[in-house]
Amino acid sequence: MTNIQKTHPLLKIVNNAFIDLPTPSNISSWWNFGSLLGICLILQILTGLFLAMHYTADTTTAFSSVTHICRDVNYGWIIRYMHANGASMFFICLFMHVGRGLYYGSYTYTETWNIGVILPFATMATAFMGYVLPWGQMSFWGATVITNLLSAIPYIGTNLVEWIWGGFSVDKATLTRFFAFHFIFPFIIAALAMVHLLFLHETGSNNPTGVSSDADKIPFHPYYTIKDILGALLLILALMILVLFSPDLLGDPDNYTPANPLNTPPHIKPEWYFLFAYAILRSIPNKLGGVLALVLSILILILMPLLHTSKQRSMMFRPISQCLFWILVADLLTLTWIGGQPVEHPYIIIGQLASIMYFLLILVLMPMASTIENNLLKW
């Protein structure tokens, strides 16, 4: 009798992707984050679905409906905080996953990488629109400030902003459309993730050495399924500790004040996972320049395959590049810190230096280090 998982048209796809997939025998825990991102996405879609059952996308009742979810709905508070903090876990996994790709040279799989660069953009757009929905002070002013950035686009900017707003300010029309988009986007992300996986399975996974592992492959199940389950348990443990002990740790207290267009909060800042990009935006005095730098801070990842000058794929045996990589990580942490600080001395100059350093590292120093390492190999 033939095995149904190998003959059934649907099960065959699942089998080839998650069970009999030939996988390098030496991939480390840094390769867990792909599956963790999948778990995060499923968790966000499920909790979001239950929240949408009780939420009303109207300026007069949105804030009250979120309060109602937390106070009156059965386990509404846990669903709400799992959704809010689940976004933070999602971005932690996303940053780790991208960092792994940079460190081990996974970007040489260009199709997989390019879809993988579109995914953070889609995720950031979704998270931004979701942050607007509770209709607190930071929701309203965050939406106003960030959408207003589009007005920096020459000629069509102002019309574009008013078109997105659905009026002359952030109002009911804006909230309704943001809710609609926030609902549909995770499914677009899921579709993109499937394409991402499709391209990955054309080439097979990379591994820490960056050398072809065709001679040494093992089946994905049971070896990596059990490893992924461990990662998933640790992820859920971290999420539940956050949700049950300090659910508001990563939130902004201003968002517990209902939105008021007549009263601007002293410091408008986005959620922590946008702060590095926000710091880059603020470090440039020109509005259009800032917006371009903001977009380029993530879009620059598209150039990674072109900027790869090393004869080796992975950074495993490249100490100079390793050093620069960890400086880049420290630089991003600095930018994240600066993004949450007020615009005053010395934060302005630190932010500007960190922003210059960010682009300098990726565009100049890392390719130079690779060239130096290539020459050192000749000795």
Curated annotation (Swiss-Prot):
Q: Which residues bind heme b b566?
A: H97, H196
Q: Does the keyword Transmembrane helix apply?
A: yes
Tell me the cofactors it needs.
heme b
PROSITE patterns the record matches: CYTB_CTER (PS51003), CYTB_NTER (PS51002)
From the record, give the transmembrane residue ranges: 33-53, 77-98, 113-133, 178-198, 226-246, 288-308, 320-340, 347-367
Q: Which CDD domains does this entry report, sorted A to Z?
A: cytochrome_b_C, Cytochrome_b_N
Q: Which of UniProt's keywords are assigned here?
A: Electron transport, Heme, Iron, Membrane, Metal-binding, Mitochondrion, Mitochondrion inner membrane, Respiratory chain, Transmembrane, Transmembrane helix, Transport, Ubiquinone
Which one Pfam family would you cite for this protein?
A: Cytochrom_B_C
What one GO molecular function would you report for this record?
ubiquinol-cytochrome-c reductase activity
Give the location in the cell. Answer: Mitochondrion inner membrane
Sites binding heme b b562 sit at H83, H182
Cofactor binding note of this UniProt entry: Binds 2 heme b groups non-covalently.
Task: Share an example GO biological-process annotation for this protein.
Answer: mitochondrial electron transport, ubiquinol to cytochrome c
According to its record, how does it sit in the membrane? Answer: Multi-pass membrane protein
Quote additional remarks.
Heme 1 (or BL or b562) is low-potential and absorbs at about 562 nm, and heme 2 (or BH or b566) is high-potential and absorbs at about 566 nm.
Q: Which family does it belong to?
A: Belongs to the cytochrome b family.
Q: What is its biological role?
A: Component of the ubiquinol-cytochrome c reductase complex (complex III or cytochrome b-c1 complex) that is part of the mitochondrial respiratory chain. The b-c1 complex mediates electron transfer from ubiquinol to cytochrome c. Contributes to the generation of a proton gradient across the mitochondrial membrane that is then used for ATP synthesis.
Fill in the subunit field for this protein: The cytochrome bc1 complex contains 11 subunits: 3 respiratory subunits (MT-CYB, CYC1 and UQCRFS1), 2 core proteins (UQCRC1 and UQCRC2) and 6 low-molecular weight proteins (UQCRH/QCR6, UQCRB/QCR7, UQCRQ/QCR8, UQCR10/QCR9, UQCR11/QCR10 and a cleavage product of UQCRFS1). This cytochrome bc1 complex then forms a dimer.
- Its recorded name reads Cytochrome b
Recorded source organism is Cephalophus dorsalis
Gene name linked to the record: MT-CYB
